[in-house]
Amino acid sequence: MLPPQFRFWLFDQMSVKTMRYVSAIPDRQAEGLTKKVYDMIREDFFRNGSLTSRSKVPELMAAIWIAGRESMLVADKVDRTSKDAICAVLSQINDCPYCEDMLVSLVHASGEHKAAEDIFGQNDLDSTDPKLRDRLEWVRAIATPGAENVPPSPFSKAQMPEILGTLLAMSDINRFSHVVMDDSPVSAPFGVKAGKALQLRLFGSELVPTRRLPLQLGRSLSLLPQADLPEDLAWAEPNPRIADAVARYAAAVEREAASVISLQVRQVVAQSLATWQGEQMPISRSWVEGDLIGLTGEDLNIARLAIVLAKAPYQVDGTLAEAVLGHERDEARFVRILAWASFVGSRRFVNLIARQSAQESSQSFTRPPIDTKQHAAELAS
C-alpha cells in the first residue's frame, strides 16, 4: 500500500487527469469555504474530480458534498457497501465511466469483490450476496429508461430517504461528470477489459483507508445555511438529517442558478421534465427541439443542454457543452448552469422513483401516471 500522503496526492492528480471545460482550484490556493470543503473531503473521503470540478463556485461544491456525504457515505439506515454498489450500477446506466470506475473500486475496497466484478462485467449478479443482489437488481430496473415490471423496493420506509438521497446525489454527479470528465483515468491496457478489472481491484485496495466508518452524522450540514425543503422533495422528511441536507443542497443550486439562468429557461425546462415519465428517448437528438420553441441565443443553448442532460445524458456531447460555455470560457458561470441542469434532471428522476415507491404493492408495477401540471409548477418554483 502506498504511503498516505503520496496516495492522496496521486488520487487527486489522477482524478483531474481527464477534466475538461473546467479546472479545480489547487489545494494551495484554497481559502474560505473552498478550504473548509477540501479539508472535510480529505478527512472523510478523498479528493476527486467529481467534487472538485465545482470548486470555482464553492457553494455548489459544498452543496454536492453535503448531499453526497450525508446520503451516500454516512452509514445510517443503510450500509455504506450497498450504497457504493448502488451508485456503481447507477453510474453505469447513466454512462459516466469516470464515476463507474471509482465506485467499482470502492466496492472492491469494501471486500465485496464478487459484486464489484459482476457490476463491472455487467453480469447477472448471481454470485453476489443475495441481499445485495436484490438491491442492485432493483436499482438496475428502476434506473433503466423505459423499464417495466420493476420489482418492489427492497428497502424499508425508514431506509428510503437515505436511498433516494443517494440516487439524487449520484445522478447529479453522474450528469455533471459526464460533461466535465472525458472518460475515466483508468484505461484498459491494450483494450483488454480483464486488465482494467485488475487495475480497479488494485485501486480498491488503496481506497480501503478512505472508508472511515462510522462517519459523524450531519457533520457537513453547517457548511451551508438552513433552508426549507421543497414540497416535491418531501420524500426526505422521514429522516430529518437527509431532509436538512437535501434542503440546503437544493437551495444552493437554485440560488446560484438564478444569476445566470433566465426564468423563461427554468419554466421551459420544468414543463419538459414534467411530461417525462422516464422513458427511453429516440436516438436522434431532434426530439428536444419541439420543447425549445420561442427560445433564442444563450437561453436556447442552456435549455437544450438541460433537457438532454436530464432525459438522455448519453446524448450530451461537446457541441452542447461548448455552446453553453461560449467564447468567454467563464468557468464559474458554466459550473452554475451545469450544476442546475444536472440537479433538475436528477430531481425529476428521483421524484418518479419516490412516487412509485409510495404507491407500490407487493406485486410488480410499472410507472404510474404523474400530474404533469402540478409537477411543472413544483419544478419551476
Spell out what each predicted region is.
Residues 1-381:
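Hydrophobic alpha-helical segments
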